[in-house]
Amino acid sequence: ETVGADSLLQRVLFQLTPFNRDIIIVTAGSKSLPQLDGYQGARVVTDIYPGKGVLGGIYTGLAESSSSYNLVVAGDMPFLNQALLRYMVGLSAGFDLVVPRLGDMVEPLHAVYARNCLAHIKRLLERGVLEVRALFELVKVRYVEASEIDRFDPGHLSFFNVNTEADLERARQIAMRYVKR
């Protein structure tokens, strides 16, 4: 699926490339992703814990990374905001997890995870606990509140993700109206 001239994944990669050339894409199975052409630092890895949902994917990405701190985002978020991501990375020292919180809702797939989370995530997965929020009780978390997010992304478009055809159509309309790329 494309939004503007790019696929959803290309839009995500474009926003992440300035942060690190080593971009890890976790997939449920071995997939060929032709939209990765031109992104030499992007590599595709297969989920170590298939069927374990988001938490398994986060574990796999962290296990494959050599970085102490890692931006973890969903591949279907076409409107990531680099300034907000940069702000979150800047907050990460001294925390295991930096995650946006809008009221009662947190965005675990738009967060900075320390590799220190690996052992905690592994224990959760081995116990069959798949809820990402369970990790929040085990690690030092810095919540990025709405008032902070609003300074960079007042429309909260960073958290828009494409799950349905209607979402895809809405993303295309947003891209035509508001977003340069």
Language model feature labels by segment:
Residues 1-129, 137-156, 169, 173-179:
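Nucleotide and nucleotide-moiety/phosphate-recognizing core
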Residues 136, 164:
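A residue-level signal for conserved active-site and pocket-lining positions in enzyme catalytic cores
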